[in-house]
Design a protein with these regions (language model features):
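Cysteine protease catalytic domains with a Cys-His-Asp triad
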Residues: 2, 11, 17-93, 98-102
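Contiguous terminal or domain-adjacent regions
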Residues: 152-167
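Cysteine protease-like catalytic core of ubiquitin/ubiquitin-like
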Residues: 74-156
Length: 167
């Protein structure tokens, strides 16, 4: 094996280890949120708001249905439900404002256009970014999307957005 191939292989191993460690850290944060809320099941807006303020303080704007989204400033975040304010609620996703971009996290790993094709925040023209992996952290039978979303936001503030995009 030539030196270049070994260097490439070593770099791939380091990246794999980094991703593995990030996922472990993320899961640990989600478990902490579950302990704080006292369960690992479906969450309502009040529970998520209380936990979001507890962990993230003023950086956490709140919990909203998709038709009532506020403006976010740089380094602020929120959790939104895919349903409108007139519906019961179906699935929570997280939004983080990074400069001129909104970063969207979906625990099912779907492309944002497929779950929320008309997502608009404030007419600011900010770019919408999702994780390029489209990998799911939540299994179909699990109902903890709110905790996963909050866990991802906590991870963003603890480890940085670049690491969070690898989850």
């Amino acid at each position: 094996m030539c030196l270049y191939a070994r260097m490439e292989e070593t770099a791939e191993i380091k990246i794999s280890i980094t991703i593995y460690m990030s996922i472990r850290q993320f899961r640990s944060i989600v478990k902490e949120v579950e302990r704080y809320l006292g369960h690992n099941d479906t969450t309502d807006a009040d529970e998520l708001y209380r936990a979001g303020k507890h962990y993230l303080g003023s950086k956490f704007r709140g919990v909203y249905p998709r038709d009532k989204l506020p403006k976010l400033k740089n380094d602020q975040c929120m959790i939104i439900n895919l349903d409108t304010s007139k519906q019961a609620g179906s699935h929570w996703i997280a939004i983080y404002c990074a400069g001129n971009s909104y970063v969207v996290y979906d625990s099912f790993g779907r492309k944002i256009g497929s779950i929320l094709p008309s997502l608009t925040f404030d007419g600011s023209g900010k770019k919408i970014i999702t994780s390029p992996d489209y990998d799911a952290e939540q299994k179909r039978y699990e109902t903890n999307c709110g905790m996963q979303s909050l866990g991802w936001l906590i991870f963003v503030y603890e480890y940085g957005i670049h690491k969070a995009l690898k989850i």
